[in-house]
């Protein structure tokens, strides 16, 4: 009877299944995935203004960035700016319409408008993503903005 041989085969199979379940996804993500660390994003300045002669508020948020992953340099990427009220309610999400080409270092400005009924204080979060806006490529930047005050 070949019991020891069958048991050994089951043991090898079990080890293979465990490795496949736990380690392959980790290796795959570290090799192929976006980690949110490819780009170092820094705050430059922001404005939350009433536009003269118009019935809207405008939000401008400027960032500088440095790409640490050579595979990301030259690729089309995107970024998202989310605007929240003080209590955390999402007011608006905006992005760069066709994305932009990532240079080794550079800057990117996000601009959007809000109705004049918007609160006078908002919280803004900016993050760079892949072109499809599904995977983060950078750290996020969070700033509280006050109407008619440049930061």
Model-derived segments and their meaning:
Residues 89-103, 141-146:
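Solvent-exposed serine/threonine-rich low-complexity stretches and specific carbohydrate-binding patches
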Residues 94-132:
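Short, solvent-exposed, Trp/other aromatic-anchored flexible loops in extracytoplasmic proteins
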Residues 31-55, 148-151:
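Short, compositionally biased P/S/T/A/G/V-rich stretches that sit at domain boundaries
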Residues 67-76:
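A short beta-turn/strand-edge loop motif at beta-sheet boundaries
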Residues 52-64:
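Contiguous beta-strand segments within globular domains
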Residues 134-151:
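Short beta-strand elements
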